[in-house]
Amino acid sequence: MFVILKLIKPFFLPPTLILLGMVFCLWLLLRKRWRWGTIILTATLGIYYLLSTGPVNYLLVRSLETATPIFLGTDDSGAKPEAIVILAGGAWRSGPTRPRDELSGPSWRRLWRGLELYRERDGKIPILYSGGNGELFDRAPIEANLTRGYALTSGIPESDFMIETTSRNTYENIRETKKILDHKFPSSDPHHIILITSSIHMPRAVLIAKKAGLAPIPEPADFLVRSTSFGLLDFFPSAETFLNSTRCLNEWVGIVAYRIMGRL
């Protein structure tokens, strides 16, 4: 199922859809179907423009960032969290143009918030970093081990930083996390955790965690919204804005897909 989802998902996201729209438009124009060719071209360019500009991106981001309440370290039950669970956000393997393995930007921001929170809670709640490798053809995990190294260098005791290296997506992150917590805290049900991930990823992560029987306390990081006001430049297409819009739509596609599969 993991492989099937990986192969199907691009066909529901803007980069592939826009490419298919342009190819379809070209096919129509070559067949001299000018009216439909013009309609498809206009629609394709319009979608690209909207997703690349500030106001539409803002609506997409806020639809996710405001979907989950932030409990600021506690939940309605008042139970003490058993672990600070950080979900992986990606890492880059070293190669000819990259001298060393590196965490992605979202991973850094998630990890940093986890380290901050650990110290804010006086080191009384251990950290569990969950994430193997989500790539189809590169199964060797590097991300969790990278974060462990950074955490130990920053002064976190090795006994307080656990890692999980077998999961490949959010569903497996939560599943493997629950297995570790079941083993470490066998008498606890449900497991209360502080859940850290990117703000737009939090709604899907919380829904999966609750479905798995966990009691997550959302602690989002890596926020995308920068401002609630827009200037002239926000109405010009931006590659960064298009990327962020695509990330948001990726989350909505994931939520719908997981809902259909019964994982939420």
What is the predicted function of each stretch?
Residues 3-8, 56, 60-64, 249-256:
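Hydrophobic alpha-helical segments of integral membrane proteins
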Residues 45-46, 50-236, 245:
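A structural signal for short, hydrophobic/glycine-enriched beta-strand patches
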Residues 238-264:
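Structured C-terminal subdomain patch of bacterial secreted/periplasmic proteins
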Residues 29-37:
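Membrane-interface helix-boundary motifs at transmembrane edges
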Residues 26-29, 48, 52, 258:
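Structural signal for membrane-spanning alpha-helices in multi-pass inner-membrane proteins
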Residues 1-29:
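Membrane-embedded alpha-helical segments of integral membrane proteins
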